[in-house]
């Protein structure tokens, strides 16, 4: 791969996009000065967790605009040289596919950087998500399916009917992006023509042209990334909409870091140099005592698993954890959470019970498996936010018990648990439990009771049926 000085700003619509990279920063807040500092060095990468998949389109657009405007800076502020903005989203095509890249392009254009093309590469190789002849596929229980045939396509908010990515873009844009106007970088272009041919295809794109990137392997995406590097050196501007895999070659990384026991144990140590605790507890006597206790290894012996995702794979993974019979289970009943007369008592009872149990056993808390949704996408999002808020309150209530580790299952769940439940402002991706899947975050800026607590981000639609149980077993064995 060509070395690139690009600074990669990744707007991640849930916390799962960094699972194919390591030693990169992950910010949970929109602090413009902080983001510019993380991008100070050429070749640096910073993920900003926007959680926009949990927002309506207008709010998602506003968040994208705010972040990019902040990083570009106002009068007197120097924008990071060589900035490439990535709109990172789902490898099974959910999210605000059209609106978010356009919001980013609007800001770049206002700053004098008109966007030539949107690169669309939803692949996640490790999870069996790839694109061939412009059709996107997902391997489900060993069977290759067009993504329109999977339960991901039935999502209450972001459902879709097409797997051909050109037709998908036309569908999602309401016809504003005609399928026959979408360019394509084919596998033949990549494997037979190489960088030179891909440069030729991309050089023909202008005016925010959508370009589908076909990819079956990382080597395919590396060729495309090299072509992008060459064209950016000539002044061309691209915005990328992609799944997790394409971020790795854009960031200049050639391999994954699979964590061993020592690396997992190291995540329990001190935060990275330059990190700071959150302002809410810093400087207090109680905070100092708590930080000292946590760093001295006084965390509870047992950890907490939080499950919020409702995709079929997550339910099967939860069942595998239950079958091993090694955790105490707590169910948050969605019907009770949506009933104002029972909501508060249900949350308080759950917090109290988990805090007591962490002294004896690992715990798993999950929302009831019956999906509650309506035909109105905005109302479905409101229900999801109400349930997510309850999960966050449970975690916030439990964190003072200093769990040994926390695993969050589900994209929206893991963002909310990290930021609002555990109070994480900035973290470093230590690596993954499996190649390109399931990241371990080391909190760098967080409340003292969270510093030193390894945090595992486990997407709802990733991993084999035993993967969640295996991650819990590895965390448990490291702590012994």
Task: Tell where the protein language model's regions lie, with residue ranges.
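Gly/Ser/Thr-rich loops at beta-strand to alpha-helix junctions
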Residues: 14-17, 89-99, 125-127, 216-220, ...
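Short acidic, glycine/serine/threonine-rich loops at helix termini
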Residues: 20-23, 96-100, 129-137, 222-227, ...
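Conserved, well-ordered active-site substructure
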Residues: 24-27, 403, 412-463, 467
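C-terminal structural cap/anchor segments
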Residues: 354, 358-411
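N-terminal short beta-loop-beta anion/metal-coordinating cradle
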Residues: 19-49, 349-358, 429-448
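Conserved, well-structured core segments that form the ligand-binding/active-site neighborhood
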Residues: 135-274, 279-283, 287-350
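Short beta-strand segments
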Residues: 11-12, 47-50, 87-88, 119-123, ...
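Cap/lid and interdomain-hinge subdomains that line or gate substrate/regulatory clefts
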Residues: 1-12, 19-22, 35-37, 42-44, ...
């Amino acid at each position: 791969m060509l070395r690139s000085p690009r600074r990669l700003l990744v707007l991640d619509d849930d916390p799962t996009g960094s699972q194919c990279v390591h030693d990169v920063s992950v910010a949970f807040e929109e602090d413009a000065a902080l983001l510019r500092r993380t991008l100070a060095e050429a070749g640096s990468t910073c993920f900003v967790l926007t959680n926009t998949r949990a927002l309506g389109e207008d709010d998602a657009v506003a968040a994208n605009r705010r972040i990019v405007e902040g990083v570009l800076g106002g009068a007197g502020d120097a924008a990071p040289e060589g900035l490439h903005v990535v709109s990172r989203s789902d490898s099974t095509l959910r999210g605000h596919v059209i609106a978010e890249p356009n919001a980013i392009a609007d800001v770049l254009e206002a700053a004098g950087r008109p966007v030539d093309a949107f690169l669309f590469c939803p692949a996640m190789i490790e999870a069996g998500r790839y694109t061939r002849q412009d059709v996107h596929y997902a391997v489900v229980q060993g069977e290759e399916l067009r993504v329109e045939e999977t339960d991901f396509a039935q999502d209450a908010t972001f459902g879709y009917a097409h797997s051909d990515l050109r037709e998908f873009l036309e569908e999602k844009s309401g016809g504003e992006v005609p399928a026959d106007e979408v360019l394509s970088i084919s596998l033949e272009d990549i494997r037979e023509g190489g960088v030179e041919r891909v440069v030729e295809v991309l050089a023909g794109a202008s005016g925010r042209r959508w370009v589908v990137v076909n990819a079956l392997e990382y080597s395919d995406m590396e060729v495309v990334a090299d072509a992008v590097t060459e064209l950016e050196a000539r002044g061309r501007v691209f915005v990328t909409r992609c799944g997790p895999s394409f971020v790795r070659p854009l960031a200049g990384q050639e391999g994954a870091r699979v964590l061993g026991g020592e690396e997992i144990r190291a995540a329990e140590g001190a935060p990275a140099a330059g990190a700071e605790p959150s302002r809410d507890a810093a400087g207090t006597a109680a905070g100092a005592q708590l930080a000292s206790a946590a760093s001295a290894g006084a965390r509870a012996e047992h950890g907490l698993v939080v499950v919020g995702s409702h995709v079929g794979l997550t339910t099967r993974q939860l069942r595998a954890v239950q079958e091993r019979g090694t955790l105490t289970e707590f169910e948050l009943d969605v019907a009770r959470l949506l009933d104002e007369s029972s909501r508060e008592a249900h949350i308080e009872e759950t917090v109290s019970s988990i805090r007591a149990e962490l002294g004896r056993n690992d715990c798993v808390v999950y929302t009831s498996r019956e999906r509650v949704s309506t035909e109105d996408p905005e109302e479905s999002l409101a229900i999801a936010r109400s349930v997510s808020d309850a999960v966050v309150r449970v975690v916030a209530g439990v964190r003072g018990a200093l769990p040994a580790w926390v695993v969050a299952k589900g994209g929206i769940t893991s963002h909310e648990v990290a930021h609002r439940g555990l109070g994480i402002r900035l973290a470093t991706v230590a690596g993954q439990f499996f190649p390109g899947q399931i990241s371990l975050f080391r909190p760098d800026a967080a409340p003292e009771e969270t510093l030193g607590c390894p945090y595992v981000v486990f997407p709802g639609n990733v991993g084999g049926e035993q993967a969640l149980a295996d991650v819990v077993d590895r965390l448990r064995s490291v702590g012994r």
